[in-house]
Amino acid sequence: MLAQATVQLGGHGVEVFDVPGLRRMRSIRLGEHGAVEVVFSRDGRTAYASQMETASVWVIDRRTYRVRRHLATRGVWSKVLALSADQRTLYVANWVSNDVSVIDLRSGRVRRLLPTVRTPRGLWPTPDGRRLYVAGFEDGELERIDLRSGRRKVLLRTGGAMRHLVGDPRRGRLYADDMAKSEAFVVDLASERVRRLAATDSTPNTIDLSPDGRVLYVSNRGRNGACYCAPGPEWGSVLAIDAASGRVLDATVGGNQTTGLDVSSDGRLLAFSDFLDNRLSLFAIPPYRVLAAGGGGRATAHRAELRKR
């Protein structure tokens, strides 16, 4: 992780920071609005940034920081992005139009719009290109779409608010978090059976796996106040959860609404953002064997620090 890209939801684009110093290197303006999500191509040369207000995706050259293309999604309120394993297709979840844009990256055109469960957010396409999993926020649904036939199946309905998805194809697992139920789930991809993995702190947001697939990191906003747009009565947090057993291995307290989260490709660094503080934090993280031998770290102790004094 030599640089960290951060979206400006209330700004005008994307900011780039160096690692580990977190010095702001560049601001990339994306028209008159901010960005929601950023994903990178496998070779790290291209960044894709979604923009809700314009229902579009900005394609950015990582070396020059210049915008290469601006792609329309044909959806409404475009948010989460996911690249296919062959890097030829970009999937975009459209929050208001309840569909996913399937964009051919060679032509830049929308190949088709896939209907989904209500308010789609998290996305995960399987490496074989046959299935797309969708997290439905409105009703707490986890949906699987057959990308050949378009057939859909809801695997889980919690009545909560399913938010983010991350897959482990080597072990045949898919992880999901529910923001309203404060829970993390795991799907066995062979049988498509779903089980509850762990309870999280209040209002979980983003999840990510360590590169070895053994630790699931979860950012948690903390309890909302009268409005999610203002600081609530709790600080946010980040949990490190054993991806197999669901045991919380460690925890740290964040700031006001801990949201964005990412683990570096070498598994040594964890970055997270505190949404209402306009702040990034960077942590060195130990390997699994150290976390597993740590007796739970601050998994219990941190809870006493969540409520603001």
For the regions a protein language model found, what residue spans apply to each?
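Predominantly soluble domains enriched in secretory-pathway, periplasmic, or organellar proteins
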Residues: 1-309
